[in-house]
């Protein structure tokens, strides 16, 4: 009996890059907790307000996912099918980078609102990156083990 199925080899160079990106998402997400005592002390915030750091960042994941779903439903087609997974990750990285740019005026003006807005935008970018990266990770490997 002959096996006519072809085996897809894992594309390790692309997969390695994706692993590094996943590491940095985790690193940034874990680093948000470091900002809480810093903001609390330097911006004279209550404990409740300082916890908005985590709230804004993780709420952005939910909001970003809902926005992505609404766009895909409105178009009657998955946005990533047209954009591509790699481009989706790239656009997400650009959105996240734009969010980090808000930290400059936020630091100059000691504006907690700008800091939180920047973190929210970073979270929106991360949402798009992860929506694109998870199926890409499966596609890069053997579908049998995906």
Q: For the regions a protein language model found, what residue spans apply to each?
A:
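Primarily marks hydrophobic transmembrane alpha-helices of the MFS/SLC 12-helix fold
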Residues: 82-89, 115
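Intracellular juxtamembrane helix-capping segments at the cytosolic ends
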Residues: 128-142
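Extracytoplasmic
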Residues: 13-45, 65-68
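C-terminal ends and interior cores of transmembrane alpha-helices
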Residues: 26, 90-109
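Hydrophobic positions within alpha-helical transmembrane segments
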Residues: 21, 53-54, 118, 146
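Central cavity-lining transmembrane alpha-helices of secondary-active solute carriers
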Residues: 51-78
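Hydrophobic core of transmembrane alpha-helices in multi-pass small-molecule transporters
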Residues: 23, 99, 111-129
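Loop-to-transmembrane helix entry
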Residues: 16, 45-56
